[in-house]
Amino acid sequence: PRSTLFPYTTLFRSLARMEQLRDEAAHGGKQAVLCGDFNIAHTPLDIKNAKANETHAGFLPEERAYVDKWLGELEFVDVMRDLAGNIQGPYTWWSQRGRAFDNNVGWRIDYQFATPELAETACGFVIDKAPTYDLRWSDHAPLSIMYDI
């Protein structure tokens, strides 16, 4: 499946611009963090039902390859995963269907990708998941990362 409104080639073209911005920051002695909703679960650890979602948008091989490029060629660090280690989740998004939120059947699709030097200063993270479905204000939970800089 491909989006006609925002084809994957557009995603991959944006990598060249991000590489340019990263290099400009590095030449200026600066570090960078890119954060937000990527709408892509990168690995099976980032999605509750990986096998069942392998053919669904948000967990397609070409989408995950896009994140691979951020963490490989562009040398950014997935800061939350680096801090949390190889554990299932924690998730930042839950479908509004069924009881996904209540049963913690989620996806981790919100990220903070940092340059390696900045990532090394990360000292903790919080995913501010509402205590109950009724108290949440979005289908996402904010990801906050603390940096000791």
Regions found by a protein language model. Name each.
Residues 1-10:
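Single conserved hydrophobic/aromatic residue that forms the stacking wall/gate
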Residues 44-149:
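Metal-dependent phosphoester-hydrolase catalytic domains
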